[in-house]
Structure formats: structure tokens, C-alpha cells
Amino acid sequence: MQNLQKNTPLANNHISVDCVVIGFDGEQLKVLLVKRAGEDNGEVYHDMKLPGSLIYMDEALDEAAQRVLYELTGLKNVNLMQFKAFGSKNRTSNPKDVRWLERAMQSKVERIVTIAYLSMVKIDRTLDKNLDDHQACWVALKDVKTLAFDHNLIIKEAMTYIRQFVEFNPSMLFELLPRKFTAAQLRLSLIHI
């Protein structure tokens, strides 16, 4: 097949994984975020992002997602499933995000294609205990502010995916609920989704 745009360079993509972990604390849905700190043009900033990172050359996507989630949050053996790829050329259009990533990865970064993973969990003391030694925390979905990169879009797409999935497979809701739950908790989880 002939390249119709002969003068257009091929993309030099990096591949990353981003994990959307949605939890229910018995009252509301929350998303697991990690804190990000940096300096940009002399200003120190603190914001948040999804647990995510570039993948290593020798690892599979699923392995990378588990590794990244563990390294950034302390959570392991979480049931993650791929739900969408994000490859917009504008994913790295914010210079602050690019500079932060290049400092963190110690590498020049141009375009990033991310494979988004999704998990639904019940928030309990055991799960929270794993987060204690990491810069990770639960944030109510309604309270999520502007995140790094396109992570707000990824969360929005994850919630759309969950709504569609639950419509055909309501048993997915049981991942959010404690072993013993009330009808009110079930109803609340449905309302928030």
C-alpha cells in the first residue's frame, strides 16, 4: 500500500497503561488517584492523576498494569480488564504534563498511546491499609478536579463502559459491595453508576 502522505513522519509512540479503579464505600463511588508533584516554570504544583506509567520494553500490557498499580498504590492481585485505548495526538499537548513525564521517566517523550484498564472494588480497611505508604487516595467521583493528561476523559469513558456493562451483567455490582450488604447499599451503588 502506498503512503498517501509521503512527507508526513511516522509517529514515534510511547505506550503506557492507566488504571481506573472504581470503589464504593457504602455511600458513594470513588476513584483511586495518585498525587503528582512537580515544578513548572519556577512554580511548584500538586495535582492528581490516575495510577499509570509507561510500559517496559520486555513486559506485556497486563503485567505492566498490575506492576504500575502495585508500585503506585500498593494494591496487588486486583482484577483489571482492558476497556479502551486512548491515542489522541493531543494527549500530550499540555507542556506541564510533558515536562513532568520527561523528568519522571528521564527520557524524551513525544506521543503516548495509553491502554486503559478498569477495576471495580469495595473499599474497606484492608484495601485502605495498602494505600498508607503510597501517594494514593480515594476521591469521590463528584469531587474529581482537573487531572493530568486526559485522565478526566478516561474516567468519564470508564463510567460509560461500566453503565453499559452493568446493564447486561448486573452481577458486576457485587464487586463493589461487601459480602453482606443491605438493599439500600445495592440501590445506592446503582444510583451512583
What are these language model-derived features?
Residues 45-51, 160-172, 183:
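A eukaryotic nuclear recognition-module signature that targets compact all-alpha binding cores
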Residues 191-193:
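Conserved small/polar residues in nucleotide/adenosyl-binding loops
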